[in-house]
Amino acid sequence: MAKKSKALRAAIEKIDATKLYSVEEAVALAKETSFAKFDATVEVAYNLNIDVKKSDQQIRGAMVLPNGTGKTARVLVFAKGAKAEEATAAGADFVGSDELVAKINGGWLDFDVVIATPDMMAVVGRLGRVLGPRNLMPNPKTGTVTMDVTKAVEESKAGKVNYRADKAGNVHVPIGKVSFDTEKLVENFKALNSVIAAAKPAASKGAYITNLSVTTTMGPGVKVDSASF
């Protein structure tokens, strides 16, 4: 642990805490200061000037990053008949119905994304206590409750990410891995920022993005100038 603390201190020393970096500078610096022994995830953190207690100021959705996330998602689909066949053909890792509910209730969680056709939500609803806290519950807002199973599976496999503001207005989204070229991470970052900016509620007055930073797994945060996009 002491070694990690020393590495973190060394990384922090390379960052000017009083400076707002451009997108390109921030991403490059986040990569440079990553000290994990594995291919760390690069994550963007927003603090938004919104009141999530109000229904018209909730920020939630999904998007496909242009360069993916560097992780191949394991996709589970709740569907029957032709839609189950469609899900399998699209590349879903697991497809089924009640038998999957029993398996998940038994403690199995070897998947990253859950998709369901609307008619299956009564079945999936029985898993609310398991999937809900893990942000795995299918939702129309993220495109995971849909009849277009092919599109949902393909987007999940291509690098789809979900974003959602917490009670404090914070949004955390992965944009790739440290091993990515800086240009690809910047492109993903800019694509994400366009979506977050476009989601600004009409009721949000004043500065919308109050704090923005990029970091890596276990690494220090680098503040980003939101005006540099």
Curated annotation (Swiss-Prot):
The keyword Nucleotide-binding does not apply. InterPro entries: Ribosom_uL1_bac-type (IPR005878), Ribosomal_uL1 (IPR002143), Ribosomal_uL1-like (IPR023674), Ribosomal_uL1/biogenesis (IPR028364), Ribosomal_uL1_3-a/b-sand (IPR016095), Ribosomal_uL1_CS (IPR023673). Keywords: Repressor, Ribonucleoprotein, Ribosomal protein, RNA-binding, rRNA-binding, Translation regulation, tRNA-binding. It comes from the Bacteria. One of its GO terms (biological process) is regulation of translation. One of its GO terms (molecular function) is rRNA binding. One of its GO terms (cellular component) is large ribosomal subunit. Binds directly to 23S rRNA. The L1 stalk is quite mobile in the ribosome, and is involved in E site tRNA release. Protein L1 is also a translational repressor protein, it controls the translation of the L11 operon by binding to its mRNA. Belongs to the universal ribosomal protein uL1 family. Part of the 50S ribosomal subunit. This is Large ribosomal subunit protein uL1. It comes from Lactococcus lactis subsp. lactis (strain IL1403) (Streptococcus lactis).
